[in-house]
Amino acid sequence: AADEHGQNRQEWHFNEIAPAAAIINDDELALATETALKRFNLVTGEISTITPIEADVPTNRANDSRVHPSGAYWIGTMVKDEGPKDGAVYHYRAGMLSKIIGNAAIPNATCFTPDGKRAYWTDTPTRQILTCETDPATGLPTSAWTLFADVSEHRGYPDGAVVDSEGFVWNARWGGSCVIRYAPDGSIDRIIEVPV
């Protein structure tokens, strides 16, 4: 953890990959790991399992994950070595875990409109960002996934994303050295160059 000046104040080490975290409260995080969704106490360092996620698939790990405005946690999984499409996206809410997307290679760009009525997602190698309607109260999909933006003609691959207060989707491009802002209709609003 870093302070307001960017100085490292505290760090934690885990015995497995933990690529995503969501805030539970001031002292606790929900960690998406290789084997489970886990509760981590920032004060005591205690970690406990909330629910297993693909614990029986040692070749997989969690990847991009995001909290829906309803409080539901969408957790993507992928093959550790970027192999076959054996990953998925799960929905966790109120103690229930359900698979909502299967046959994914690298789940990324999971994000939601502020009102919780729409989700975005990509399987990075496809170079397509998809969208669907979601239930604002539960975070579950309520429609089929449709194409939001075909990014195959642009630089890089779709990676992490977020929706701003105006409903525009900001998408970082792995290997593309840019962040692209998409309008709600899927058209490119602007491209921000980044030095990586």
PLM region descriptions:
Residues 1, 36-38, 87-90, 128-130, ...:
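A short loop-to-beta-strand structural motif that recurs across blades of beta-propeller domains
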Residues 1-12, 34-37:
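Beta-propeller domains
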Residues 14-30, 56-72, 101-119, 151-169, ...:
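Beta-rich, blade/repeat-based domains predominating
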Residues 132-140:
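Short loop/turn segments immediately following beta-strands, especially the blade-tip
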Residues 45-100:
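Hydrophobic alpha-helical segments and helix pairs
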Residues 4, 8, 25-27, 42-43, ...:
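Flexible "stalk/tail and boundary" regions
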Residues 1, 24, 29-35, 73-83, ...:
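Conserved beta-strand positions in repeat-built beta-propeller and related beta-rich domains
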Residues 7-13, 48-55, 96-102, 144-151, ...:
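A short beta-strand motif characteristic of beta-propeller blades
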